[in-house]
Amino acid sequence: MRINPTTSGPAVSTLEEKNLGRIAQIIGPVLDVVFPPGKMPNIYNALVVKGRDTVGQQINVTCEVQQLLGNNRVRAVAMSATDGLTRGMEVIDTGAPLSVPVGGATLGRIFNVLGEPVDNLGPVDTRTTSPIHRSAPAFIQLDTKLSIFETGIKVVDLLAPYRRGGKIGLFGGAGVGKTVLIMELINNIAKAHGGVSVFGGVSERTREGNDLYMEMKESGVINEKNIAESKVALVYGQMNEPPGARMRVGLTALTMAEYFRDVNEQDVLLFIDNIFRFVQAGSEVSALLGRMPSAVGYQPTLSTEMGTLQERITSTKEGSITSIQAVYVPADDLTDPAPATTFAHLDATTVLSRGLAAKGIYPAVDPLDSTSTMLQPRIVGEEHYETAQRVKQTLQRYKELQDIIAILGLDELSEEDRLTVARARKIERFLSQPFFVAEVFTGSPGKYVGLAETIRGFQLILSGELDGLPEQAFYLVGNIDEATAKAMNLEGESNLKK
């Protein structure tokens, strides 16, 4: 059964007299609390520790019950630093799970895992709150229609299109452009679709979170003059937070997104950067709770934790949540249990390649490794499907010929293979694109390319009509008309030099 949003948070004051416990043990972010007989809190209940530390500073720490140990003891994980806590301090059982503010009041604001604003812009309306632990929608509520979600990014829309209401994984190692791609998607979707986004910053760099916030203010996604007209709510649990906060911040963001879907009946975008850190935080908590580690040191409950989060991200008859999740791949190993478990839940994968990034091709999306369940003729149409397959065949043939080219050179190839290589190199460069959010770095204005324009461009390259143009004309341009204009400019420049 799904728990509906309430119009008030858990009333701590009314429960104070009923259910008080005391801290018995503190090990880092894990607390053991003793309660009176018969007054044990439930699993996932929020506990609050209030008081003063030894130097008189105010303490307010929220914890979440994870285990019932026996002898009237519970083990809880803290959502903030446990500095200053001492044994014997009073602990209040709130009698309910963590609840966070939801609805229009969250737009344009930055929250922590507890739903508290951290942007110094004053309090948030907390009359409507929702618990972060909820069951997934029932089968009867789900929507099964298949439709494409256009992003305006050529390589994505053509070769690995996103499903509206689906789950998409951005796979890549460190420094290949996952966060930049997410920022571009937020920008494009807010401008082209007018949709509401929720961004969950799960254990990523504080600097990146700040950069993203500033970028959103500049691009108008967050409207400083009228904050209610903003298109995104931000929830951050950064690298410096305790593992409990990092493990739950994804659920806080998801709860906010669910309200927009279920109550406001909107199409929502949920960005999670980074889903691997959610698993990593779960692994830390699992070890702190004394569970036996599983493969590669991960928690034994890895599949369950991932499934609980992912099954709530879905389309219902009221609205949809389309989720785009950055997935850090440890040591670029896709067989690691964390990315491998994530794969099972995804409708599309966008794999970022270090090789393409080294060549300067951005977005560095690997056109052969990236996949989508949507790339079927009955969903995208014959023209799109045929063009995508021919692009992949051309790039695959080029990949096969690279060893021969490296040893013998281009001249030893047949005429047909030389033509394939020339077209593949044009396609590879045409898959690059200037981003709006990267304008300050590249100096090139960003481009949003519609799906029809994308298909037309690749059809022209494959047909051989543009064989006479130099390959550098296709690098970092929007549609195919820009490439032909760039080729004319390059030709004019070379004539001037002569």
Swiss-Prot record:
It comes from the Eukaryota. Its EC number is 7.1.2.2. SUPFAM superfamilies: C-terminal domain of alpha and beta subunits of F1 ATP synthase, N-terminal domain of alpha and beta subunits of F1 ATP synthase, P-loop containing nucleoside triphosphate hydrolases. It comes from Agapanthus africanus. One of its GO terms (biological process) is proton motive force-driven mitochondrial ATP synthesis. This is ATP synthase subunit beta, chloroplastic. The gene is atpB. InterPro entries: AAA+_ATPase, ATP-synt_VA_C, ATP_synth_F1_bsu, ATPase_a/bsu_AS, ATPase_alpha/beta_chains, ATPase_F1/V1/A1_a/bsu_N, ATPase_F1/V1/A1_a/bsu_N_sf, ATPase_F1/V1/A1_a/bsu_nucl-bd. Belongs to the ATPase alpha/beta chains family. GO terms for cellular component: chloroplast thylakoid membrane; mitochondrion; proton-transporting ATP synthase complex.
